[in-house]
Amino acid sequence: MLKRLLKRPSLNLLAWLLLAAFYISICLNIAFFKQVLQALPLDSLHNVLVFLSMPVVAFSVINIVLTLSSFLWLNRPLACLFILVGAAAQYFIMTYGIVIDRSMIANIIDTTPAESYALMTPQMLLTLGFSGVLAALIACWIKIKPATSRLRSVLFRGANILVSVLLILLVAALFYKDYASLFRNNKELVKSLSPSNSIVASWSWYSHQRLANLPLVRIGEDAHRNPLMQNEKRKNLTILIVGETSRAENFSLNGYPRETNPRLAKDNVVYFPNTASCGTATAVSVPCMFSDMPREHYKEELAQHQEGVLDIIQRAGINVLWNDNDGGCKGACDRVPHQNVTALNLPDQCINGECYDEVLFHGLEEYINNLQGDGVIVLHTIGSHRPTYYNRYPPQFRKFTPTCDTNEIQTCTKEQLVNTYDNTLVYVDYIVDKAINLLKEHQDKFTTSLVYLSDHGESLGENGIYLHGLPYAIAPDSQKQVPMLLWLSEDYQKRYQVDQNCLQKQAQTQHYSQDNLFSTLLGLTGVETKYYQAADDILQTCRRVSE
């Protein structure tokens, strides 16, 4: 009995190819077909036929690819690859509403082990285990009967390819205009079609990475200090805090009814309520905000081998330090002193390879005390990073309850999810306030200033979308509108004639973006170069005396 159960089932090659093609193209593309139904109403027989033709085309394409690969005995490994990739893509698309594109592949490559662990849920393991791993094992377990005639096998496979090609041509002849209109008006649809979405996105990522090995492009080689800032005995110290996954609409400084920024509300900061990010993922936004390229003309491949604003500031003679608690600076700090404080794994501050952002202050007091000359310190926070929001803040910051204390955020109620996310912002408020107080403690030695700017926002289940990383053109504002604030010591305002009342009024009426960071940092630190654009410097119009 057991022997009979364990006996390998057998199929002829053609049947195996058809079965594998059906599973990959139909069963692993449920997410794609669901999205098609949202864009294509089945309100007429014609639209019904257009929709029904799509599985036919998907099946035919995969059938052709697998059949061609069988001539090289690659049909099993290729089918297994398609199954594993398709199962993973479908899970993340259906669970989090993501899009598989180059940015998402970059996110996957940049994901730390701790972040990967945080994404692992029982649902994920079961889904990928059954639809991916088990299906791939079954594809390998099924025995393919040897062909009785090699010529007959070749002819059958050739006929199989021909029929698939004819089906594709028939659909094209009948519905080409419908397909062209549907995919032209819904360009992101194709990014849900597996396994082509993962293959195209991976190739695009590889092409961009290959260009990153080009020689370094130097910019701002004319950089020098403004004499007004260089000739004073009192030195200048600026802290830039790069936020992670903080969305503007949940900042109480932005008008959010909940008090998520109780400390910053008392710090006399200038908050900029209309600030847009450069991208919807860290891998895009961080290198973009430190580059001299505006979002509309931003080129990822160039940013990977071109200097940024920190290089220019350092070249002008300012000490630069980057403290990282978010898995790396994505190239923005490659040529300045930097350290991964997460790796310190400090007790009471770190959990499963991730740390609370307070770890960023470890050794910072000593660094400032020993600092000779002007300085810029960048603190790269983990902020509200997905999806284990409840691990981003210590227990004492659990202000809003009940919370979503799981990485299966889609299983939590809206109230639980928002409560947990808002608690991360209460902790962000604490971190930024702590940095301001640190600067205040050193005002006897330095003229101080601080900038906080988040890399991108976050979706919390609105319209079935979670996390971030959607293509910019279709991403909701919750992923693109980010908090930005500026704190200037009274000494800075007096010494460099900056009118804070002017800044407050300007902040409420003007629209800003991460494009402003490059020239604002140069102006804030008094670095002059031809790359500086006064129109992008937030402080420029509120300086009483021209520098």
Curated annotation (Swiss-Prot):
Biological processes per GO annotation: lipopolysaccharide core region biosynthetic process
Xref: Pfam families: EptA_B_N (PF08019), Sulfatase (PF00884)
Protein location: Cell inner membrane
UniProt membrane topology term: Multi-pass membrane protein
Signal peptide start-end: none
Keyword Cell membrane belongs to the record: yes
A Gene Ontology term for the protein's cellular component: plasma membrane
EC number, as in UniProt: 2.7.-.-
This protein's name: Phosphoethanolamine transferase EptA
